[in-house]
UniProtKB/Swiss-Prot annotation:
<keyword id="KW-0150">Chloroplast</keyword>
<protein>
    <recommendedName>
        <fullName>Large ribosomal subunit protein uL16c</fullName>
    </recommendedName>
</protein>
<dbReference type="InterPro" id="IPR047873">
    <property type="entry name" value="Ribosomal_uL16"/>
</dbReference>
<keyword id="KW-0689">Ribosomal protein</keyword>
<dbReference type="GO" id="GO:0009507">
    <property type="term" value="C:chloroplast"/>
</dbReference>
<dbReference type="InterPro" id="IPR020798">
    <property type="entry name" value="Ribosomal_uL16_CS"/>
</dbReference>
<dbReference type="GO" id="GO:0005762">
    <property type="term" value="C:mitochondrial large ribosomal subunit"/>
</dbReference>
<dbReference type="GO" id="GO:0003735">
    <property type="term" value="F:structural constituent of ribosome"/>
</dbReference>
<dbReference type="GO" id="GO:0019843">
    <property type="term" value="F:rRNA binding"/>
</dbReference>
<keyword id="KW-0934">Plastid</keyword>
<dbReference type="InterPro" id="IPR016180">
    <property type="entry name" value="Ribosomal_uL16_dom"/>
</dbReference>
<dbReference type="Pfam" id="PF00252">
    <property type="entry name" value="Ribosomal_L16"/>
</dbReference>
<keyword id="KW-0687">Ribonucleoprotein</keyword>
<dbReference type="InterPro" id="IPR000114">
    <property type="entry name" value="Ribosomal_uL16_bact-type"/>
</dbReference>
<comment type="subunit">
    <text>Part of the 50S ribosomal subunit.</text>
</comment>
<comment type="similarity">
    <text>Belongs to the universal ribosomal protein uL16 family.</text>
</comment>
<dbReference type="InterPro" id="IPR036920">
    <property type="entry name" value="Ribosomal_uL16_sf"/>
</dbReference>
Length: 135
């Protein structure tokens, strides 16, 4: 699972997912990519599941780039706990995805293989996505 080695602060505010992604919205490394169409929190488990699905389908062919990294801690309170007594402890890590963000890139394979591998990874994501081609 992906998570930061160390952070400046243990806990973060939840924040808002306003607007579109201005950074990380162009294909930089591969020839094909998976682009987000909705805002959401994507957990490190979902990122890893998508990466594994793509790797399995492509087998040894091609290269995969994961363009997102979960850097936001999400805290969870224990079940049946009364209100108060502070914020819960960090349980998992998420990445805040905005529309337009590139999630995965793929290169060194044919378009048919890339399209199928990326569609399998897209089914692991909690949001609507689209397959895009560089150029």
């Amino acid at each position: 699972m992906l998570s930061p080695k160390r952070t400046r602060f243990r806990k973060q505010h939840r924040g808002r997912m306003k607007g579109i992604s201005y950074r990380g919205n162009r294909i930089c490394f591969g020839g094909y990519a998976l682009q987000a169409l909705e805002p959401a929190w994507i957990t490190s488990r979902q990122i890893e599941a998508g990466r594994r699905a793509m790797t399995r389908y492509a087998r040894r062919g091609g290269k995969i780039w994961v363009r997102i990294f979960p850097d936001k801690p999400v805290t969870v309170r224990p079940a049946e706990t009364r209100m108060g007594s502070g914020k819960g402890s960090p349980e998992f890590w998420v990445f805040v995805v905005k529309p337009g963000r590139i999630l995965y890139e793929m290169g060194g394979v044919s378009e048919i293989v890339a399209r199928e591998a990326i569609s399998i990874a897209a089914s692991k994501m909690p949001i609507r996505t689209q397959f895009i081609i560089a150029g």
